[in-house]
């Protein structure tokens, strides 16, 4: 026990160093509303149709530890039977191989993260798994460091289920940069308030619905198969075409919590300063939201609605509810007509390395003390086990 105690202290010190001292310190861009004389409309020219896709679902993997209970090929076949064009089986830290026919549009996806705090992301389009993570940490700077690591290999990166285990806060999404989308609706709930927080802070991120199912079946009424999906607005049936449309926000999300039928989007256009939306049926309500989720306008019982875009609208997004289902449109944003803003958290190199060096010196000192305590013939040091845990003779 006398030799084990110093080694345990050293191990805990090394873990504390990685969790507390290694993550960079950042200067996060302050909140800044979207600005510009032009409106970026990801739906300009859209007249219906698209590729039906899901990127977040779990099969039987890792010996059942992740609670998926359906073999991957069977789950893939279920989505294929429902007419999905793009099927992403996002098992934890495991790329989903192609399971479909030769005509399948294969876009890889996996869920990154193995932390108790569930700070997870769906990584779409990567060619390998990134294993870097902070197993215990949940600070904003640790989350930003993980995003930066994932960004190097992730063509499209989604922040998952923000309130599951309190994995992300409103403040996190207002500060973090480098992610492309936030899950707005899955079996775990709805997070349009987190989405609005990010948009209100000037983060040009899109909203994505998904199943996130772990127990998927065709017959079980409790299955989450098909409750969340995206319709991608592209005629390119290729990986690159899908990823390009995702990055540009050219998709809309469908959330059918009780497996209601989908809502068909027909158009979303800006003409004469009016944002005009039309769907294929009379909607229960069509709502137009501005910053911080402020309800700007709504129309009930009609298949279409318009809203006059104001000078004080940095962005406007639309939700359509019909027969219990919800259609989420990505926002129209003010921009300069050239490129959407790309806020980027800046690493504070001086602070980062000062803390890393100080932490390394502290671990080195503990290593020296532990080595003394473990040296044969040592009479004990500050790191020796307390007398209460030594064996009596």
Task: Describe the residue ranges of each PLM region.
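A metal-dependent hydrolase metal-coordination microenvironment
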Residues: 15-177, 183-201, 208-220, 329
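Glycine-rich loops and low-complexity Gly/Arg-rich segments
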Residues: 77-81, 113-115, 130-134, 148-149, ...
């Amino acid at each position: 026990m006398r030799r084990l105690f110093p080694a345990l202290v050293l191990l805990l010190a090394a873990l504390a160093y990685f969790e507390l001292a290694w993550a960079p310190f950042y200067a996060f861009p302050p909140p800044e509303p979207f600005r510009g004389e032009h409106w970026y409309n990801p739906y300009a020219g859209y007249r219906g149709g698209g590729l039906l896709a899901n990127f977040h679902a779990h099969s039987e993997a890792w010996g059942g530890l992740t609670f998926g209970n359906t073999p991957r090929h069977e789950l893939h076949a279920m989505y294929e039977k429902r007419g999905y064009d793009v099927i992403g089986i996002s098992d934890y830290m495991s790329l989903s191989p192609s399971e479909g026919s030769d005509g399948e549009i294969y876009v890889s996806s996996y869920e990154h993260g193995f932390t108790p705090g569930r700070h997870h992301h769906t990584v779409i389009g990567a060619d390998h798994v990134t294993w870097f993570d902070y197993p215990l940490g949940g600070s904003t700077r640790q989350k930003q460091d993980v995003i930066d690591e994932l960004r190097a290999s992730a063509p499209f990166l989604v922040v998952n289920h923000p309130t599951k285990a309190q994995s992300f806060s409103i403040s996190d999404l207002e500060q973090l940069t480098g992610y492309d989308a936030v899950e707005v609706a899955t079996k775990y709930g709805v997070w349009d308030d987190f989405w609005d927080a990010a948009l209100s802070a000037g983060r040009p991120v899109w909203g994505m619905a998904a199943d996130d199912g772990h127990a998927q079946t065709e017959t079980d009424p409790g299955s989450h198969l098909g409750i969340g999906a995206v319709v991608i607005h592209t005629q390119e049936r290729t990986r690159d075409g899908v990823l390009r449309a995702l990055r540009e926000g050219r998709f809309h999300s469908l959330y059918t919590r009780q497996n209601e039928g989908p809502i068909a989007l027909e158009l979303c256009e800006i003409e004469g300063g009016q944002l005009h939306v039309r769907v294929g049926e009379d909607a229960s309500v069509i709502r137009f939201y501005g910053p911080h989720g402020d309800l700007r306008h709504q129309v009930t019982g009609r298949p279409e609605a318009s809203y006059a875009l104001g000078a004080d609208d940095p962005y406007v997004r639309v939700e359509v509810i019909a027969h219990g289902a919800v259609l989420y449109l990505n926002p129209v944003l003010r921009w300069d007509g050239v490129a959407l803003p790309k806020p980027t958290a800046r690493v504070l190199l001086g602070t980062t390395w000062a803390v890393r060096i100080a932490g390394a010196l502290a671990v080195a000192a503990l290593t020296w003390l532990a080595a003394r305590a473990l040296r044969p013939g040592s009479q004990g040091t500050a790191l020796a086990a307390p007398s209460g845990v030594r064996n009596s003779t």
